[in-house]
A protein has these predicted regions:
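Hydrophobic, small-residue-rich alpha-helical packing segments that form membrane-like cores
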Residues: 1-14, 34
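Short, conserved micro-motifs enriched in small and acidic residues
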Residues: 8-16, 173-178
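Hydrophobic helix-and-loop "lid/oligomerization" segment in the mid-to-C-terminal part
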Residues: 26-253, 268, 272-275
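A contiguous loop/helix-start segment that scaffolds small-molecule binding in enzyme catalytic cores
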Residues: 50, 73-76, 255-297
Length: 297
């Protein structure tokens, strides 16, 4: 059972929790199975779920990035070759190349593709499923752009709400999180995108560092405004009955207004440096502090 008072656990996504649960089972069975070989997938899930790259997540990231050899993973190695990449794996590769490709199947209704790809050593299956997923990811990009083209950004700007809540029928539910992230980045405001899903609304949220969207989703659950949901500081998802949409909007806007928040575009720094000291050696030393990610820049 999860200890809700343990803040360490708030940094872990479901994949990480599953990994540690299986690790305990392996220890109980005194098995010699090497679960650490699968840490690459824990890190990919951590990055794609926008979890803070701090504490145990930072330890996992450092170990994986330092030790992982792309040639030992046939699926990732094949995908790298399709893009002509010949370098060591980075956090950006997981977040912007491999992650989106692996996730593309699930977003567009073919979740079995990634399972088949990552659970086989058969080179023919690896080739076919990798190419299929790359094609699906390209299709996802086109669908995503078509959705963005239909959004009235000027209207959203004129409404000037503290939290952007956008509803549209017939958005593919696998894309609402990406659209929410795009709106959040464009307006620098917490953003929620909802669409129809089997006679109920499905929502996905992306937030700014000054507004904990996971806490808001919990409040909405406690108030029975939404049917179910969950999340963390920066992202979350939920389902809600259509007739509760205005209630949701009003509750979130009021909650935001009642909080004393630091500006979302305010960044703190530890010291000032002269431009003259920025050179290759300085950048190399800075990179030694990595890998960098959410809440760790």
């Amino acid at each position: 059972k999860k200890n809700v008072n343990n803040k360490e656990q708030q940094y872990l996504c479901a994949t990480s929790l599953t990994y540690f649960f299986i690790d305990i089972l392996i220890q109980k069975k005194n098995s010699d199975f090497r679960l650490s070989n699968f840490l690459i997938y824990v890190l990919m899930a951590t990055i794609c779920d926008v979890m803070p790259l701090r504490k145990i997540n930072k330890i996992i990231a450092t170990n994986v990035i330092n030790d992982f050899n792309i040639k030992t993973n046939a699926a990732f190695n094949f995908i790298f070759k399709q893009f002509g990449i010949k370098k060591k794996l980075t956090i950006d590769d997981l977040g912007y190349l491999l992650g989106p490709i692996i996730n593309a199947g699930g977003r567009l209704g073919y979740s079995n593709y990634a399972t088949e790809l990552l659970s086989t050593d058969n080179p023919n299956i690896i080739k076919k499923k990798s190419i299929d997923l790359i094609k699906l990811n390209n299709k996802r990009k086109i669908l995503e752009q078509n959705i963005l083209n239909k959004i009235n950004f000027d209207k959203i700007k004129q409404e000037n709400k503290n939290v952007i809540i956008y509803y549209k029928d017939n958005i593919h539910e696998g894309l609402i999180g990406i659209i929410a992230a795009k709106l959040k980045d464009y307006f620098n405001k917490p953003s929620i995108v909802l669409t129809n899903s089997n006679n109920i609304l499905k929502g996905s949220a992306r937030s700014t560092p000054n507004y904990n969207i996971g806490q808001i989703i919990k409040k909405l659950l406690d108030k029975k405004i939404i049917e179910n949901g969950g999340g963390h500081n920066m992202a979350g998802g939920f389902t809600i009955k259509k007739n509760n949409f205005l209630l949701l909007d009003n509750f979130i806007q009021k909650d935001f207004s009642n909080k004393i928040l630091a500006p979302s575009n305010e960044y703190k720094y530890d010291s000032e440096i002269s431009m003259s000291i920025i050179n290759n050696n300085f950048i190399n030393e800075l990179n030694r502090l990595g890998p960098f990610g959410s809440y760790n820049l």
